[in-house]
């Protein structure tokens, strides 16, 4: 007992000097964890960092394709000072993404495991005091098939804004989203992992200096889609209090809207399993090793589009599904009924979402920048698996976006805008309007800046490509070298906006450009240099696509009635 008291006295003394000599130890409901202190250049306040804290049992054996279960308790002091393994995924794609997106000075070497349900915590709190700082829980992107927690260092955001940052991992790909669309494997396992992590935060974050009554979930791309799903899910009620969806929401056709059962059969067949019944497929796939499932995953070529085969037979991603549990009914119904979590909500897109990085990842044949309408129509149809645009709609879409030019380079740019609108712009506005109409505070932004850290291969004129805002949100200029004063100030402003929103449900604050609420006037903020308010983001595009889809639905139901007669 006296040893514990002595340790506590010395820890208090060290912390008061700002240079702790003893590593931080914190109690969780499962056992004690030992972390490390990190200091950001220019700040005396150290950040206590805990890497690889388990929030659930390893999802192995019978827990593959099953909801996560709470972690087993431990009786020793668990060292949580090194990054956890990433969830199983394509290692080459993971490395490519980390190189492009990370705010770290150098890439953290990757290890992969099915045992991957861990989270990282960055807390600037004095752990000897009863601090109650706002908590920001990050859900990474990567198309629900790649990436992990080690891409994001939470120290700059934690120390600049005095918030507790938590970065979670969740099952990906086949492991995270395999669905037979019935009780044998409902799917959405990765989203259920996210819910489990939020339960862990509620139970434990107070001991890390965080306030469990002030939790903001935020995520980008598939992480933004995940945030959007959690906003709709009754399972996540009261687990968070604000939400930020960056560059994707539930209606992104890449990640939601396709039948999962044909994909399940294809996966099972590639694994050498019988596909006669759901039970047979699930039982067989549970017997496969991690490496055998990875081999199947690589054969499926997730994260790329097949521009040669039948697009209706191609599955570039494993989708979020309506499972009756996480999503009890269709998102459209949940939004119409206003039966979702009406927390303050920030939704945003980047100016050129489909500018360079996603076409490159998906192998779009656009490198020559020489496009004509016929080729554009062909590419749109081949991209059906990620866009869900039927052949009937393609001529109208091509005419609307490309009809005003004959120049191949301009046509290419407009074509990229078309796809960006389908995947990101239009769904984001639709979700924001639904949230606003339910009476919840809503804010929108469009990010319009080219970070200095992006690849030299990218066209110079491209401002606000997919994921560009990550460098500002995560304080990359304070970890990487070469940022200008302008870029440093932009990052400070963006971190302040995000943290203000986490604190108050409103991004505005002293010394910041005014960010209008997204009300009936549809004000939003253009984030760039300078940042300025504007109105009606993508409203004409939303009108066009809403009308076009409604016409198609009406024709389909009229045809169905005719057939029935």
Swiss-Prot record:
Positions glycosylated per UniProt: 388, 489
Alphabetically ordered keywords of this record: Cytoplasm, Disulfide bond, Endoplasmic reticulum, Glycoprotein, Hydrolase, Lipid droplet, Lipid metabolism, Phosphoprotein, Serine esterase, Signal
PTM-bearing positions, type Phosphoserine: 378
Signal sequence extent: 1-18
Keyword check for Kinase: no
Cysteines engaged in disulfide bonds, as pairs: 87-116, 273-284
Top-level taxon in the UniProt lineage: Eukaryota
One cellular component (GO) term of this entry: cytoplasm
Name this polypeptide is given: Liver carboxylesterase 1
Species whose genome carries this gene: Mus musculus (Mouse)
Top-level taxonomy: Eukaryota, Metazoa, Chordata, Craniata, Vertebrata
């Amino acid at each position: 007992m006296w040893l514990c008291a002595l340790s506590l006295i010395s820890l208090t003394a060290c912390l008061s000097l700002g240079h702790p000599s003893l590593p931080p130890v914190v109690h969780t409901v499962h056992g004690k964890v030992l972390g490390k202190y990190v200091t950001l250049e220019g700040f005396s306040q150290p950040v206590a960092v805990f890497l690889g804290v388990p929030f659930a049992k390893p999802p192995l054996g019978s827990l593959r394709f099953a909801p996560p279960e709470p972690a087993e308790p431990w009786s020793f002091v668990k060292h949580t000072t090194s990054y956890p393994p990433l969830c199983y995924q394509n290692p080459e794609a993971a490395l490519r993404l980390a190189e492009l997106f990370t705010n770290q000075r150098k890439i953290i070497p990757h290890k992969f495991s099915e045992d991957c349900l861990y989270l990282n915590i960055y807390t600037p709190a004095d752990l000897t005091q009863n601090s109650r700082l706002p908590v920001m829980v990050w859900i990474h992107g990567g198309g629900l098939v790649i990436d992990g927690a080690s891409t994001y260092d939470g120290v700059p955001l934690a120390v600049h804004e005095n918030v507790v940052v938590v970065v979670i991992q969740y099952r990906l790909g086949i492991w995270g989203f395999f669905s037979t669309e019935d009780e044998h494997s409902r799917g959405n396992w990765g989203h259920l992992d996210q819910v489990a992590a939020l339960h862990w935060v509620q139970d434990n974050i107070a001991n890390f200096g965080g306030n469990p009554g002030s939790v903001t979930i935020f995520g980008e791309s598939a992480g933004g889609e995940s945030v959007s799903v959690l906003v709709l899910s009754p399972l996540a009620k009261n687990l968070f209090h604000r939400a930020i969806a960056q560059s994707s929401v539930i209606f992104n056709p890449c990640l939601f809207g396709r039948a999962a059962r044909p994909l399940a059969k294809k996966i099972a067949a590639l694994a050498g399993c019988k596909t006669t019944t759901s039970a047979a497929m699930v039982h067989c796939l549970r017997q496969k090793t991690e490496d055998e499932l990875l081999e199947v995953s690589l054969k499926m070529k997730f994260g790329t589009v097949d521009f040669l085969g039948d697009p209706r037979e191609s599955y570039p991603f494993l989708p979020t599904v309506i499972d009756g549990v996480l999503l009890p009914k269709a998102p459209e119904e949940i939004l119409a009924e206003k039966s979702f979590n009406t927390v303050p909500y920030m939704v945003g897109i980047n100016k050129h979402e489909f500018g360079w990085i996603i076409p490159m990842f998906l192998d779009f044949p656009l490198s020559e920048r020489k496009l004509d309408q016929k080729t554009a129509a062909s590419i749109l149809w081949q991209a059906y698996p990620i866009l869900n645009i039927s052949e009937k709609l393609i001529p109208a879409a091509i005419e609307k976006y490309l009809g005003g030019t004959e120049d191949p380079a301009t046509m290419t740019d407009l074509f990229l805008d078309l796809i960006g609108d389908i995947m990101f712009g239009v769904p984001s506005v639709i979700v924001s309007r639904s949230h606003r109409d339910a009476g919840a505070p809503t804010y929108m932004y469009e990010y319009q800046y080219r970070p200095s850290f992006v690849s030299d291969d990218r066209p110079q004129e491209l401002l606000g490509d997919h994921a560009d805002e990550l460098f500002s949100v995560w304080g990359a200029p304070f970890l990487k070298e070469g940022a200008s004063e302008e870029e440093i100030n932009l990052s400070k402003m963006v971190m302040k906006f995000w943290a203000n929103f986490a604190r108050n449900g409103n991004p505005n604050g002293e010394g910041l450009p005014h960010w209008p609420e997204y009300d009936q006037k549809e004000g939003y903020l253009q984030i760039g240099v300078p940042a300025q308010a504007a109105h009606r983001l993508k409203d004409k595009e939303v009108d066009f696509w809403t009308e076009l889809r409604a016409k198609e639905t009406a024709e389909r139901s009229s045809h169905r009635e005719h057939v029935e007669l």
